[in-house]
Amino acid sequence: MGMRMMFTVFLLVVLAITVVSFPLDRESDGANAEARTHDHEKHALDRNGCCRNPACESHRCG
C-alpha cells in the first residue's frame, strides 16, 4: 500500500467520522441533557408557593 493510497484512506475515514457525528450533534443541540430544563420546570412552584429557580423574580421566598 503506497503513501498516496494510505493518505486517501485516511481522508475517507475523517470524512466518514464527520458525516456520522454531524447528525448526532444536531439531535443533542450541543447541550448537556442533564443541564437542560423545560420551561415549565424553570419557574415551577413548590408546595409553599415559592419558586425553585434562584433567578425567579416572582414568588421568591427566603
Curated annotation (Swiss-Prot):
InterPro entries per the UniProt record, alphabetical: Conotoxin_a-typ
Disulfide bond found in the keyword field: yes
Subcellular localization, as worded in the UniProt entry: Secreted
Lineage: Eukaryota, Metazoa, Spiralia, Lophotrochozoa, Mollusca
Domain-level remarks: The cysteine framework is I (CC-C-C). Alpha4/4 pattern.
Principal subcellular localization: secreted
Family classification: Belongs to the conotoxin A superfamily.
Name of the protein in its database record: Alpha-conotoxin-like S1.1
Tissue localization of expression: Expressed by the venom duct.
Function text: Alpha-conotoxins act on postsynaptic membranes, they bind to the nicotinic acetylcholine receptors (nAChR) and thus inhibit them.
Disulfide bonds: 50-56, 51-61
Keywords: Acetylcholine receptor inhibiting toxin, Amidation, Disulfide bond, Ion channel impairing toxin, Neurotoxin, Postsynaptic neurotoxin, Secreted, Signal, Toxin
Maturation propeptide residues: 22-48
Cysteine amide, modified sites: 61
Listed GO MF terms: acetylcholine receptor inhibitor activity; ion channel regulator activity; toxin activity
